[in-house]
UniProtKB/Swiss-Prot annotation:
It comes from Caenorhabditis elegans. It comes from the Eukaryota. The keyword Endoplasmic reticulum does not apply. It is found in: Secreted. GO terms for cellular component: extracellular region. InterPro entries: DUF1505. This is UPF0375 protein R05A10.4. Glycans are attached at N59. The keyword Secreted applies. Belongs to the UPF0375 family. Residues 1-19 form the signal peptide. Keywords: Glycoprotein, Secreted, Signal.
């Protein structure tokens, strides 16, 4: 097969696949945290932050849910209340919702 024909076929497949909407099975899950040793820290000014992002297809739309929590030793026991959002992927502003709404059964998978 000629290299230019092969390249054209690969290019056509790439263009066609980029136009395919996100699959119902699409899932992206990421977590970032510096809270691992927070509870054991003796530093009275210790601070930790944790974020989990879940990107998926829901009712044929791309949705991204974000879980964010910040804990500060100096603020006492009432800090560290998570803030969550559930927003369409193409939106410019996050839509704040309760964490149960944003993560449903996946909320139990978040360990911060």
């Amino acid at each position: 097969m000629n290299l230019s024909i092969f390249s054209a076929i690969i290019f056509s497949i790439t263009i066609a696949s980029s136009a395919i909407p996100i699959s119902e099975n699409y899932v992206s899950w990421s977590s970032d945290s510096n809270c691992l040793d927070f509870d054991d820290s003796r530093d009275p000014n210790a601070v930790c932050e944790a974020t989990t992002t879940w990107k998926r297809s829901e009712n044929s739309s791309c949705i991204v849910s974000v879980y964010y929590v910040k804990k500060e030793k100096s603020s006492g026991t009432s800090n560290g209340i998570p803030q969550c959002s559930k927003t369409p992927c193409d939106a410019t502003e996050k839509i704040v919702v309760d964490c149960e709404t944003a993560f449903r059964e996946k909320l139990a998978n978040i360990n911060h």
